A protein has these predicted regions:
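A short glycine/serine-rich beta->alpha loop
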Residues: 130-139, 176, 221-228, 379, ...
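Acidic/histidine-rich catalytic neighborhood of metal-dependent amide-processing enzymes
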Residues: 121-208, 248-264, 268, 272-282, ...
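Phosphate/diphosphate-binding glycine-rich loops and adjacent basic-rich segments that engage nucleotide
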Residues: 185, 194-227, 231-237
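A non-catalytic alpha/beta surface segment that caps or lines the substrate-entry region
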Residues: 22-70, 74-76, 80
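N-terminal capping segment at the start of a domain
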Residues: 2-28, 129-130, 318, 378-379
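Glycine/charged-rich beta-loop-alpha catalytic/anionic-binding loops adjacent to active sites
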Residues: 120-135, 218-222, 342, 374-378
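Active-site metal-coordination/substrate-binding segment of hydrolases
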Residues: 67-161, 169, 391
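Metal-dependent amide/peptide-bond hydrolase catalytic core
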Residues: 235-405
């Protein structure tokens, strides 16, 4: 079975994660895909495949003869999707021989256009997979799962010698909780790769330092006709807080190694308001400055409007794995060589986000990230090509070959 055929099957399984439940996994939907994957792994000969109570799927492939004592290499992808644009089942749409131009996404009224996504012109002639425009596609990260499964099938059909291989599919990556209950010992790998990137040939070992900030505002609500010098409008103080952050430090205005504050939720009225942000920066020093900036604004506004008007809670999420991967750069060198074997330009880029691998690296499992061939994740314009997925599979297999050469 081809990788894209698996993807078409997986995206039809509803698996959004949720920040609201406080459970692990955050949604029971994810077990539906986990059980399907366990069954498929067993059919592919991964005899010990199982899913645990927290919805982590594990499996192991024995070494070929003579390679039993070699280091163990792992591959990881995540089963959950974002909850945005995911209120009903995905309907994947295949467009053979894509012409590189505007493409209407079903009857949604949305158009996938090179004006918005310039790389689309480079996909001309490929077989493009999208949703119908009413949901995400779910290639993030079901494409990674499909590619790992196809790699396993290919290993069964060819003679690539290899040491022990370890496979894992995780829940709740999209809410930053993928490694929360990851059993490093059970997984067993010395090194691993996540398949959770974008363009095929992408190799990533630098990610954001990340934190979440919740800012709450307590107002004083009195009748507006008699409120002079008395009312404190929590909603207006919230607006004031946001206006004091650097106006150009938003996701829309930044790229590459530039960090940002991202306001993703606003709720409020006169009595109470709340702003929720994510804070991101590749540079640890600048990351700390961003957190201090929010603390300083909180102090200023409390001095202006009264003690207790503004409260700030910052929660650390993950760190830049570069400091770990720098000690085992052979992982990057092998991935780079694997791309070159197929005349695919290796794209070494910083991750403007995080992956399970970032946290796993700090848990003792160095784990850079590889591209799956997908683009425009987390929204209705998400897309991937059959050819890009095929290349990602070949690169993964070549990494295995080079790792044990």
């Amino acid at each position: 079975m081809k990788a894209y055929e698996r993807l078409l099957s997986y995206v039809k399984v509803f698996t959004p994660s949720s920040e609201e439940t406080g459970t692990s996994p955050s949604t029971q939907y994810q077990f539906d895909l986990a059980r399907l994957l366990v069954q498929e792994l067993k059919e592919l000969g991964v005899k010990d495949a199982d899913v645990d109570e927290h919805c982590y799927v594990y499996g192991h492939i024995p070494a070929t003869r003579g390679y039993e004592s070699r280091q163990k290499l792992g591959f990881i992808a995540h089963m959950d999707t974002v909850s945005d644009f995911c209120d009903h089942l995905v309907t994947p749409v295949i467009t053979p021989n894509y012409d590189g131009k505007d493409l209407a996404l079903g009857t949604s009224g949305r158009v996938l256009s090179p004006k918005m996504f310039p790389h689309l012109s480079t996909l001309k002639g490929r077989t493009l997979i999208t949703s119908d425009g009413t949901t995400i596609l779910g290639a993030d990260d079901k494409a990674g799962i499909a590619e790992i499964m196809t790699m396993i099938e290919s290993l069964n059909d060819n003679t690539i010698p290899h040491g022990p291989l370890c496979i894992a599919f995780t829940p709740d990556e999209e809410i930053g909780m993928g490694p929360a209950h990851f059993d490093i010992k059970k997984f067993g790998a010395d090194f691993a790769y996540t398949l959770d990137g974008d363009t095929e040939g992408e190799i990533q070992y630098e990610n954001f330092n990340a934190a979440r900030a919740v800012v709450e505002f307590t107002g004083v609500n009195v009748h507006p006709g008699s409120s002079k010098n008395t009312m404190v409008n929590a909603a207006l103080v919230a607006m004031e807080f946001n206006s004091m952050l650097p106006s150009a430090d938003t996701p829309r205005d930044t790229e590459d190694y530039e960090g940002f504050f991202h306001l993703y939720s606003i709720k409020g009225d006169v009595s109470h308001a709340a702003l929720e942000y994510i804070i991101r920066d590749h540079n640890a020093t600048t990351f700390d400055v961003r957190k201090k900036t929010m603390k300083h604004i909180t102090k200023i506004l409390n001095e202006k409007w009264g003690k207790g008007t503004v409260s700030l809670t910052i929660t650390e999420q993950y760190r830049n794995m570069k400091e770990i991967i720098d000690t085992c750069m052979e992982l990057i060198e092998r991935a780079t060589a694997a791309c070159k074997e197929y005349n695919i330009p290796p794209l070494i880029t910083p991750i403007r986000g995080g992956t399970d691998g970032a946290q796993l690296s700090f848990m003792g499992l160095p784990c850079p990230n590889l591209g799956t061939g997908g683009h425009a994740y987390h929204g209705p314009y998400e897309h991937i090509t059959v050819e890009g997925m095929n290349i990602a599979v070949e690169v993964g297999l070549k990494i295995i070959e080079l790792f044990y050469k």
